[in-house]
Amino acid sequence: SEYGVHGGAQISLRTDDIARITNAMQQLRTNPPKAIAGMPVSSISDYANGYEGLAPSDCLSYQLSGTDRVVVRPSGTEAKLKVYIEVVRDAKNDVDATRKDAMSVVNQLGESITQLLAL
């Protein structure tokens, strides 16, 4: 519990049309969400031109309140978008209850981003 409780998930959103993935990433860049699952987006990192010394990559990272974040990128090998969700909660009290809360938030974020991307 010294480092808090970490909840996470990887979601793969498949499609038969690779153009839908390109369009979804472009839509996220031109019309970024202001909130995901009701949680305000505090900053967006777009790795298309490189970022903090990293090579360019078709990847977007949405920082939410606190340390929660959602990362979206196309798969490099298949017609799908990959979504990574990370939620961190302070666990000074009941670790089990905190873990349940963190995973509940992970699930809410997953449902929200899946609806937003609508592949």
Regions found by a protein language model. Name each.
Residues S1-R73, K82-Y84, A91-L119:
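Phosphate-binding and adjacent anionic-ligand microenvironments
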